[in-house]
Amino acid sequence: MGWLSSIFWAFWYILPAYFANASPVLVGGGRPIDGGRVWRDGRRLLGDGKTWRGFIGGVLIGTLVGIVQYFITPDFYGSLETAVKLAFLLSFGALIGDLVGSFIKRRANLPRGYPAIGLDQLGFLISALAFAYPVKTLSSGQIIFLLVVSPFIHWGANYFAYRMGWKSVPW
C-alpha cells in the first residue's frame, strides 16, 4: 500500500470517531450525564456540557457514518456486521474518551469549554482506537499519522463550529 493510500484508509477508518466526537455540539443539550453529581473535590463529575442526548446522538451519527462507508467501500469492512461493530466501537470509544477528558478537566478545575491541549485533541482518538482494536486496527504508521494530524483537524473543526455559531468558543 502506498503512503497516499495508507493516509486515505487511515482517515476512512477513523471517520466514524471524528463524526461522533463532533456531533454532540449539534445534537446535544438536555439532561447532563452526571445528573448534577459532584466528586469528592466538590466539583461536578463531568458538567452540563456532557449530555445523554449528545452522547447517544454522537454514537448514533458515528455508527451511521460507518454504515454509509460500508455501502461505499464494502471490501474495506468485509461484512456489514463488521462495519456496524467497528463504527459503533469507534464512536462509543471516542465519546468515552471525551468523557474521561471532561472528568480530568473538572478535577484540574478547568471551566467548561476551556481548552486542555492534547487531552481535547487526542483523548477521543486514543480511546476510539483502543475500543475498536478487537474488531479492526490500523498499522502503527497510520496510527502515528492520525495522532499527528488529528489535533489540527480538531482545531479546524472547532473553529468552523465557532464561526457557524454552533460553539461559543473557537477551541
From Swiss-Prot:
UniProt GO cellular component terms: plasma membrane
Main location: membrane
InterPro entries: CarS, CarS_archaea
Pathway terms, separated by semicolons: Membrane lipid metabolism; glycerophospholipid metabolism
UniProt entry keywords in alphabetical sequence: Cell membrane, Lipid biosynthesis, Lipid metabolism, Magnesium, Membrane, Phospholipid biosynthesis, Phospholipid metabolism, Transferase, Transmembrane, Transmembrane helix
Topological relation to the membrane, as annotated: Multi-pass membrane protein
Pfam families per UniProt: CarS-like
UniProt protein name: CDP-archaeol synthase
Originating organism: Thermococcus kodakarensis (strain ATCC BAA-918 / JCM 12380 / KOD1)
